[in-house]
Amino acid sequence: MSLSVDRLSLSSEQYTRWCAETPSLPLYVQPWWLLAASGCEEMPVLATRVAKEDAPTLVWPLFMPTRRHLIVTPYCQFTGPLSDRSGAVGEEPFDRDRYIAHLAAMEALGEALPSSLRYIEAHLPLDYWDWLPSETPAGVWRSSVAYTHRLDLTQRPPQELYNSLIRRKVRRATALGLRELWAETTKEATNVATCAEMLVELCRKSLQRSGGDRLCASSLRRLVTAAVARGQGALLLLLSPHTDEPVAGAFVAHHAGTAYYIAGGQARTSEGEDAMALLLDRLIIWSREADCHTFDFEGSIQRGIAFFFRSFGAVPHPYLRLQAGRQTLAMRLQLRRYYLQHLY
């Protein structure tokens, strides 16, 4: 079965409209999120469409900080070629014609990528593996599996799913009398900016202790501002009753019924030891009140704390991390310059 496939370049208006008409897409690929995370004024979007169809079949927002890099945008769990509907491959019953159409569209999309690319990254659901092209301008794909952790907010009170450790931490932190400072509206712009700076400092301290990557602070500030302005996010800080200094903080954004834990940090003090459990408990309650059915603990800057997430009753969900090509030293230095100018 041979299909004719059109290659398209979508304007920002066309991509925004396509996202609005495709409710299955997550927060991470929404136009406003991508622009705030990347610091770009506009992001090129490549698309393919099976002939005789009105809407694009596959769409790929291209974050290319240099002409040789196509990489994952900061604070984005999923990025890469997007389907016009979720489960196009793994759906029941199996739709053979749809599957073949996606294979053809994906092959055309791979061929349309800029030939200058030498290194490509993508994070995608597992079912994409069956229809990814084996070749890219940067070479063949290499894959690994990563996990996000999701908590179902619909079945029963989430607190019933917490293990004994988390319940004990929440009780101890509650007894400390920590003061809550929220940034969830733009009525006090200064408050949002001040809270964002406090969160940045807490995240930096946490990353320094864990030996993690450098914080994309500029991206985080823009995301907090954009999400709060749209009514799709909240930043919560817990302050010491003795010093009025923040001991823990986190930023959560939501879209289409899912709340996403984006970033968080805590101070290395006796008060901060249990504060993060109380903080997340408060944000989970906030997410339910915002009519979210799922709390996603992905935490784009958090590494090595999966056990902590599972202690809240969250269930691991696998996804693909894909890479093609290699970075030379010159490419790494060029990419670092971009990060220093726009993201750090």
Report residues per predicted region.
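Terminal substrate-recognition subdomain of acyl/acetyltransferases
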Residues: 2, 124-179, 294, 299-344
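A conserved beta-strand-loop-helix scaffold within acyl/acetyltransferase catalytic domains
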Residues: 3-53, 62-68, 127-148, 156-270
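Short, high-confidence coil segments that cap the C-terminus of an alpha-helix
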Residues: 42-45, 114-119, 233, 292
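Conserved acyl-donor/pantetheine-binding loop and adjacent beta-alpha core of acyl/acetyltransferases
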Residues: 64-80
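A short, internal acetyl-CoA/4′-phosphopantetheine-binding micro-motif in the GNAT/acyltransferase core
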Residues: 76-96, 154-156, 264-273
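Aromatic (often tryptophan-rich) hydrophobic motifs at membrane interfaces
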Residues: 95, 221-334
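Well-ordered, non-membrane alpha-helical segments in soluble/globular domains
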Residues: 96-109
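ATP-hydrolysis module of ASCE/P-loop NTPase motor domains
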Residues: 111-127
